[in-house]
Structure formats: C-alpha cells, structure tokens
Amino acid sequence: MNSFLSLTVAVVAAVFFFGNVNAAEPEHFTFSHQKLEREYMLYLPDGLPSDAPLVMVLHGYGGRSMKGGQNLCKVADREKFAVCYPQGAVDGKGKTCWNVGYPFQKGLKTDDVDFLCKLARHLQKEYGLSRTNTFLTGMSNGGEMCYLMAYLKPDFFAAIAPIAGLTLDWMQKDLNAKGSVPLMEVHGTSDKTSLWNGDPMDKGGWGAYIAVPIAVSKWVNEARCSYEAVDSLPMKVNAVPVDNPKNEPRQVVLHRYMGGVPAWPDGPETEVWLYEVIGGNHSWSEHSMDTCEEIWKFFKKWIH
C-alpha cells in the first residue's frame, strides 16, 4: 500500500470513528505498577473542562484495551468526560486478563484492584479530572472485575456498570460488601459464555458463579431498594441489515430497583438497574440497545 493510499485510509477511518478529522483521538500511555509497565488508552475530548468526570472501561478475557465500549468516546465528545481503557496483564496462558479469581488464575500475583485505583488517582491528578465523579464499566472478564470492585471498593467509584458480567461463587461466599453502590448490568438471557442462570457446577471452567438476577439482587439488598419499575426499551432498528442472525435486535426489558439509601449524605436514593436482553448473546448488546448511551445515562444520575 503506497503512502498516499495509507494516509487516505487513515483519514477515512478517523472520520468514520470520530466524526471529523479534527476530533481528538485516544492516546497510548504506560503506568508503572508493582514492577509492571501497564498500558492504557486515554481519550480526552476537545474542550474538556476541569474537574470533568472519568469513565474507566475494562475489556474481556484475552481482549485489548479498546476492543469494546468504543462508542463511549462519541458520548464523551458530547457530554465532556474522559474515557480510559486500561489493558489487563498477561496470565499464565498468555492471555490478557483481569485477576478476578478464576480457578486457572490461582497463583497470579497481579493486584488489579490496586492497579485500577492508583491509575484513576494518577489520571485525576495529571489531567485535573474529578475524584468524585469517576465511574467503572467493563464487559465479560471486565464485568467480573466491576463486581469485584463493587465488593471491595464501593466508595471509590460513583457508579459501576458490568456488561455480561458475573459474580463468582467465591465472591459471594468470601467477601462482605463494604457498602452499597449504584450499579447497572446488561446481560443477554441466551449468553452461552456467561450464563444468565449461573454455572454452580463450573461446567464452563470459569469457576462456579451465581445467576445474574441473584447477583444483581445482592446490590438491590445492599442499597435497600424498596420497589421495582419494569419497562421495555423500544426495539432498535438497524440501519444496515445484519449478516448474523445472532446479532438481530432483541427485546430489552429494563428492571429498575429504586428507593434505596442515599448514594451519599443528602444525595439521591441509590438505584440498581438490570437490562435483560431477551435472547441476547455474549456481547455489549449494541445491536439491541444504545448500550454506551444507557451507561452514561445511568452514570450521569450520580454526578455530584
């Protein structure tokens, strides 16, 4: 490919992803943590104000930092928040991951809880981002990391949004939640990797884990939510026909558990939302809903 053609392709890609060639682009950085050079991508929209919110996005097992959740950059352009895509460390299988206590992660020394907290503090200080309005989302293995953070650091993030995430059995049995946290989960009922009804016998090899509704009810109870509202999202119409039936739009049922304890002193009541994607697969479910828009809609409720 000649240099002119290469430049043309790069410009077209930038226009497609960011909307115009003058838009900001994610940048690659490293961060030293426990003798490891950890990588991350950082997106700072043009015109970002001081004390802007920060959203951290975690990839799935074996993934790359920006493999999922890229559309949050488009939301960030409009809403003016920073987006960080950290990279998981490599495990014994040579796969990038978040250390959440899968059976095959036994002996893995990586402390991702500490890494994410220290990386967030670094970004807040370096770029003048909000310490209060920092949020966490992630898909699959990244979703499991979100749940682990909810147990161990509920006061660090203003709200948490696991996507196709699980609560491993050991988390439920061995950890005592240190408080409530606004939480939303998006999960397909036909997910073949992270089963909606759980895997108590560990047939999938990820370790035993509980059913998604039970996992979510943990945080409903922690928040002492007093009532549930159930709505169906409008069916999404794809502009381009899908070539895979698995990616056809699905009905999404939103369960909102409300009336919880104050999210902070004199703050709004804590809420927990569950997006039940009927027949949905193991994905960000963006073929069925505007997932990144919904994530920000939830996070925005907890800005203070």
Residue ranges: model-predicted function:
Residues 1-9:
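Bacterial N-terminal signal peptides that target proteins for export
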